[in-house]
Amino acid sequence: MGRSYYVDDGVEKYFSKLIQQQKAYVTGLLIGQYSSQRDYAVLAAQTPQKEDQSEETKSGFSKLEGIDDEWVSMHASQLGRMLPGGLMVLGVFLMTSPDLSKDAQNVLRKLVFTVEKSSMKNRLWNFDDDDVSERVTLHICSATKKITCRTYDINDPKSTPKPADWKYQSSGLSWLTIDCSVRVDVTIPLTSSSLTYQERQKSIRLGLVKWAKEIEDSLVLFNGQVKDKSADLFEEQKKSSRSSSHYSPQIITANVLTAAPLIDSTRSTALVQPCKSSLTIQGVVKCCGYIHSNRPKVKDALQAVKRDILNTIQARCEMLFEDMMLNGPSKGTENEVCPLPQRVFVPIKGSSLKLCDYLFGDETSSDLQSHFLEIMDQEVEQNELEFPEKKCSCTQPEERESEPVSYNLESKPVDQANSSSKFLLNKGLLISTVVASIAVIISFYYII
């Protein structure tokens, strides 16, 4: 028996709007959540048109061969950054006129594997045994509105399509919000102070992978309680009366506790690594995750919040280096504090879910609105934007205790008397000390 997708009726309305545009074809992404029992689709977003495609895609003037799968995968990468924990790209959709329907399934198969490959490229986490490996493809005929829903196993390149049910829900889907603020403190040694941005980005990723293991192994408290991973998130509901068994809190607070490595009796060997500079990511970031409220499990809540932590740090690092490669370093970058992208949340209309985006210091709310329209195909009002992280005022480190999200590049010689309070290179051994801050900062300390 194939998978069943329970779909928010807003997706049906969105498809109706696309049909009215009378294009020969439209590609896009499906957003939602997989679970062991049911799968949920909450949003659909069409792929932004390329500039040279505007005339080509008018009815009667295009063929499916003109679909650029790399362009669709780039859209998926950009959109993936805007999804909080628990939400993901479920698959792809293709809307065509009747004369183009014949080759739709071949195109969808190619797209779904390309999109998944792109989405997995820079993840700091790996799928586990409980993750669903099937991705959905949806073909809609713009004339008859007939829907063909199939799934592919993305772990098998030779996977054959399986039929699936696409069920619209007249009532809104119910979601549980997991709210979390996490302190991040990562120091990454760099072997050379003259690394290119690409080389530096690779080094940073290797360091983040090690940090990601700490997050994966961390202990999470839900509303101050430790819960068994395999248990229901709300065990007390089982003991309550039937009249109140339908109730569950809509927002719970998570606290993430990372512990220092345990010291045992086994012999350990110190790792000596030559280092010219180091990069430090520090501070507190705002995170959230969503799981469907139908008998939520602890393991699902853990997965949602931990993956959101990893995703938001990875996204900010990627965006920072993309901005540097595109615009070059700012003047005086070696000695000044620069804001990292600020996380901004936007509620989905008619739902308790929220999407997110990132705002650089020189960008405005209008830029965010334009980006949401381009990537998510959603119009956002300025008063709907939520800023849980304050902008960094670029103060000195000792004045930055309440400042989130900043980027600090600093050059200091180590032969000064007070340099040992930061970083010290002594006979090839690098000793780093933790610097308390509520900002997310990236600091380079160059060692001479």
From Swiss-Prot:
Belongs to the ODR-4 family. Keywords: Membrane, Transmembrane, Transmembrane helix. The keyword Membrane applies. The chain crosses the membrane at residues 76-96, 428-448. Its main location: membrane. Pfam families: ODR4-like (PF14778). It comes from Xenopus tropicalis (Western clawed frog). May play a role in the trafficking of a subset of G-protein coupled receptors. It is a multi-pass membrane protein. This is Protein odr-4 homolog. It is found in: Membrane. GO terms for cellular component: membrane. It comes from the Eukaryota.
